[in-house]
Structure formats: C-alpha cells, structure tokens
C-alpha cells in the first residue's frame, strides 16, 4: 500500500513540476518521499531558490507561510491544514505592537516559528541555527525576542552584550523535558553525549555536551570522534535522518518528545494535496510584503 502510494506521489510530482519539502520532525515515510529534508532555515532557502512550480510543504503552517512569502509566484500547499504550531500561536501581532510601543528603540527578532502577521512587525526573523549570529549582527543593543523564551535565553547567554526582552512563549515538546529525564536515560543506557536543542530550558541545556539546531546536531554527531553513543534531546523525528547519515553510531531518543502537529501529515495527505491542489497557502499582498522584509533580512544576516 505505502509503496504504491509513494510511486503515485512521485509521478504526480513529476507531472506538476512540484517539490516536496519535509522538516526533520516529519514521519519517516514522509521524509522518504521528500526532495529535500532539513531544518526551518535550509527549507526556507530552498523554497526561495528552487524553480519548481509547486511546493508541497510537509511541516507546520508557519513554514508553508514562510515559503509563500519568499516565493509568491509558486503554489504552496500544506498537505495537513491542522498542522499548526502552539508556540507560534503564543505570539500575537496586537501584543507585539504593544511591546514595541513600550520599547521604541528595540529591534524585533522573531523566531521563524511565528505567524505571518507577527513577522510583518519584525525587523528580522531567525532560526535556531542562526539566532545568536543574527542578534549579534543586528544594529541595536536592545532586542525584543519572540516567541520562544528558551531560545531567547540561550541567545542571551551567547550574546551577553545585548539586552534581550523575552516573550513568554515556549515549545511544549522541548519545554517539558527536565534534568531527571536525562539522568534516567543515562542510568539506563550508560554514559553518552547529550545533544540538546536550544528550545530546551536552561537546566537541560546546562547538561548538554552540544547545543544546536536539528541540522547542527546531525552534523556534530557525524563529525564527532569522541563518542559513539548520544542522547538526542529534541523531537523524535530527527532519528530518521540521524541514523541514515551516521549509521555507525547509536542514538537514543526521549520517547516523550513527539510533536503531534509535525506527525499530523501522512502520505495520504501528500497524495491528496497533489491531486487536488489542497490546501493552498494564500497571503494578502500588503501583509506578504511586510513579512518579506523580516525573512529576507534573516537570509542576509544569517549567512
């Protein structure tokens, strides 16, 4: 069944000059049929630079929105319309406008995990792979950072010379992990290196041997010569690409770290989206132009 469906998807993709982008947190079978698998930053670049007519974005809504902002001439499809991001929903344009009024000299840096309405009010976006670099490069000593307070506190540690005003948002999957979860895994499986995403809260980050984005974690594990066992403290979907890229090492996920929104997309959704061109992302042009500035600044500052 799955193999037949995959073949039909690949044929539809060819017929429609479409590409399938999948985030590392997607289901393994979805990653298998993707043209490109990556983190938010790399997928944003691909969406902008690729010459396909249609982008099928297997991720969550803010990712598909970002692709449409960067590539308005392309048809952008989100196969599963219920795939939202609770953290992105924690930041609203009205609240951000009020915070900007309280801090008129601050520059606003939004994690790409935000709505297009929030991006329209920001000076630049960032991802977990380039947040510290962008905050360091932006021409202001005062920064409003949203929506993730954990990533923001990590950036504050990396860029102590800046005054960072944190929004009170978080990723539910990463924020729920506590130090005892790490200790239990080490007691069960023995000594191993800990790879943690910066969306984790500080007590967990402090236990990590390496802190980085999903892509950076895979790169680190591939190049590291000091260990062959790793505890991977991020969403479990990363295991598919991590084990493929580094088959000679052992990776232990935290089984509780499952994002139901990232796992909402199934092969059937991708097939139906290609057949019926559903569900297409449309953004009002004035709003798109405002959001475009923050995403383009991210691509420039994040180089």
Swiss-Prot record:
Q: Which co-factors does it depend on?
A: [4Fe-4S] cluster
Which positions bind iminosuccinate? 23, 40, 111-113, 128, 197-199, 214
Report the pathway entry.
Cofactor biosynthesis; NAD(+) biosynthesis; quinolinate from iminoaspartate: step 1/1
What remark does the entry make about the cofactor? Binds 1 [4Fe-4S] cluster per subunit.
Would the keyword Cytoplasm be found if you checked this record's keyword annotation? yes
The record's keywords, sorted A to Z, are:
4Fe-4S, Cytoplasm, Iron, Iron-sulfur, Metal-binding, Pyridine nucleotide biosynthesis, Transferase
> Which amino acids does the record list as binding [4Fe-4S] cluster?
85, 171, 259
Report the subcellular localization: Cytoplasm
Record EC number: 2.5.1.72
Recorded GO MF terms: 4 iron, 4 sulfur cluster binding; metal ion binding; quinolinate synthetase A activity
Reaction catalysed by this enzyme = iminosuccinate + dihydroxyacetone phosphate = quinolinate + phosphate + 2 H2O + H(+)
Q: Name one GO cellular component term.
A: cytosol
Q: Which family does it belong to?
A: Belongs to the quinolinate synthase family. Type 2 subfamily.
Function (record text): Catalyzes the condensation of iminoaspartate with dihydroxyacetone phosphate to form quinolinate.
Name of protein: Quinolinate synthase
